[in-house]
Amino acid sequence: YPDHLNLLYKQSFLEKIENRSKSPHGKQKSRKFTFDGSSSGSSDISQIKNADELDNCLQQFLETISSADYVLREIYEYTTVLPESYYGQGSYAKWIRVGWALKNTSNKLLIVWIAFSAKASTFDYNTIQDLCDQWDSFSRKEAGVTNRSIIYWAKQDNPSGAEGIRKNTISYYLDMTINAVTANAIANPSKTAKG
């Protein structure tokens, strides 16, 4: 994971991070990274310090996803089945594309990218602020990678995991309903004809 950060940042940005950590007041928070959380307020994602805090923040995010934003839950699930080749040693190109795809899908998915990154055996919770800053620097691109890219990668690199998720998606149930109605209309055309 440290290789990700070394490749990820330009030298000037690395110097900024180093200077921030050397300041007498410790790391300076560049801004608060939040999502709409529980009634007690929003969690500052950039201040997560350990696996338990990350898990709590992720669960809070998942519990607050509205039914209208079902695609956010689906993309979280597809992201979880991406294999280690997307977040492990030497995976920078794939790892950064996952970040771009999540950002292009929704700015709310920062917590998903951090949880995904934390799957790396070398993940350091002290880099979460840096990941938040990196996320903030991603520009959304209309023609860029999106949630559809993550679904494609999951299908290519973990077909059984992706299929298990697909069978629990709203899209799957809509397709099943449409196919059943269409099959019924073909089998019984007189019942569907208007007269």
Language model regions located:
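Alpha-helical structural motif
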Residues: N50, V71-I75, W95, L109, ...
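Death-fold interaction domains
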Residues: T127-S171
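Low-complexity, intrinsically disordered short peptide segments enriched in small/polar/basic residues
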Residues: L14, S30, S42-I45, L72, ...
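N-terminal nucleic-acid engagement/recognition segments and initiation subdomains in replication
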Residues: R73, Y86-A115, K155-G195
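Catalytic cores of large soluble enzymes that bind and process phosphate-bearing ligands
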Residues: S67, T105, E142
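DNA replication initiation modules
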Residues: Y1-P83, I151-D157
